Every structure is written in structure tokens, then in C-alpha cells.
From Swiss-Prot:
Its main location: secreted. The keyword Repressor does not apply. Keywords: Antimicrobial, Disulfide bond, Fungicide, Plant defense, Secreted, Signal. The lineage of its organism: Eukaryota, Viridiplantae, Streptophyta, Embryophyta, Tracheophyta. GO terms for cellular component: extracellular region. Belongs to the DEFL family. The keyword Signal applies. This is Defensin-like protein 199. It comes from Arabidopsis thaliana (Mouse-ear cress). It is found in: Secreted. Disulfide bonds join 40-80, 47-72, 56-78, 60-79. GO terms for biological process: defense response to fungus; killing of cells of another organism. Residues 1-24 form the signal peptide.
Amino acid sequence: MAITMRTLVAFVFTIFFIISFVHSRTTTSGYGMLFDSVACEGGFEYCPRGGGNDKCTTFCRSLPNKYDFGVCDKIYACCCHINV
């Protein structure tokens, strides 16, 4: 009985491991990623102190790559993003 119970527990853990591995695996490029393309442009003029995401977004939309929006990071650089 103990060998059967031990085998059953090992089998159940093996099944859980296989399911979690397959479930978290990426099968296509870009799947599961928040952004496909990111470009950070340094420039204090686009990200004033205390934010400035609106000015950054305006700048990013004017670029040739037509980014969707911009976000100011902690060093006041404007990072432009394209949604997936």
C-alpha cells in the first residue's frame, strides 16, 4: 500500500510539473510580451520634473516609427512604446 501511495503522489507531482511547464511556455513570437518595440530617447525637454507623459507621448507620435505612447522614466528620458 505504501509503494502504491508513493507512486501515486510521484505521478500527481509529475503531471502538475508537466502542465505548469507547458502552460507557461511561449509558442509564438511576441506572445505574452507587453511591448514589441521600445525606444528611449534622452531629452529633458520631453520629460519635465514631476512627469510629463503627455509631452512625451506627443513627441513619440511625431517620430517616423509612429509609436503609440511615451513614458517618462526616472532619469527624465522619454521611452516610446509600440503596442503589440
